[in-house]
Amino acid sequence: MTLISTKWTAHIVWLLGQSSEIRFGQIQKQLALVSSKVLSERLKLLSKEGFIWRRQEETVPVTVYYGLTNKGKELADIVDIIVKKSDSWN
């Protein structure tokens, strides 16, 4: 429970669930209020826990892509249900 309750984590998982893969800059643009430092920390934690994968292309500058693992997709489905239910209450 600690991981998903950490600020921005659910937002990141939900956003990653909306596409097959996404670059760091795209995530940051979508979540405009999150700092680069916090976003990087959350992505590292989610990767370490097996919820997301990370792919780095050796381009100049380096391009890094993120996506959900099967475990992450299960979590994203749960987050999506919560988001939809919350939207229905508003």
Language-model-derived ranges and their functions:
Residues 74-90:
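Short, solvent-exposed amphipathic helices
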Residues 39, 43-46:
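Basic amphipathic alpha-helical segments that dock to polyanions
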